[in-house]
Amino acid sequence: QSLGFKEVPASTITTIVKGPQEGEFCSECYLGNRKADVVVRLHDTRLMPIECKVSNSSTNSVKRLNNDAAVKAGDWIKKFGALQVVPAALLAGVFNVLNLEQAQDAGLTIFWSHDLQPIGDFIESTRGI
């Protein structure tokens, strides 16, 4: 909301044109067959599903990141296309570096909750594209 985005009611998003429109977001909605914590419609009209994950140990990070968020990212890319969705994770806590690299290789863009400037900068960078 601090970027000027408006929250809209959650709905099931079955095609790339459904769901929040440019400058809007919704919480807890289905994108395809998988639930996303937040879905943002970027200024360039791509969808950015964001998974919020907290891990208290590097062992736990496999479950949170690789077995959940990265699997969802792969599904979303397969269903909607790599040019139409930007799957992301907003992370807090302890994560194994190898698990982070594997998640990125699966198509997940990673941001950290302790520093929200990069995700805000990315979202703003889609303006005028």
Each language-model region and where it sits:
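Catalytic core segments in nucleotide and nucleic-acid processing enzymes
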Residues: 4-129
